[in-house]
Amino acid sequence: LKGYINLAGSLVVQNAGRPTYVPSKYDWGWDFSEGLARVLIHKEVDLYGFVDIYGNEVIPPKYQYAENFSEGLACVYNGIKYGYVDKNGYEIIPLKYDEAGNFSDGLAKVRIGGKYGKYSPILDKIEIEDARYGYINNLGIERIPILYSHANDFSEGLAAVCMHNKWGFINRTGNVV
């Protein structure tokens, strides 16, 4: 594991003011997100898992890729499909997507085959329409029409979108700014 050191340079993970040593079986580690840090073991195939702030392995390294936790879930990849796990390692949203991203404001952008859409955890379904992007809220209600050939997640109230090969920004009501 690389990256969790104290002021003396010793490998540690801080918790409640006392250091805890992390087993050196990990080849890499990332920043903590929502109380867990991604770790990596290099084998024939890289394997990702998660440790808590005490250095305990919470989710064993078994995924070929993983993202940091966002809104209580982490996107993981098993070498074939993407899905989402909770902080206990349970696959809450099945690994059935060809592409998936982090949750942002209750939504996650996902892709099945050549089609794109937004996954709603509340409705446990994906809204897809002719490989176009739009935005729905966490209740599955379409908030911004599905019009865009490409769309990014919202950040600081704006999202970059593409229509007719032209990029611009929209606000949360769908107005171009």
Predicted feature residues:
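Residue-level detector of conserved, function-critical positions
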Residues: L1-V177
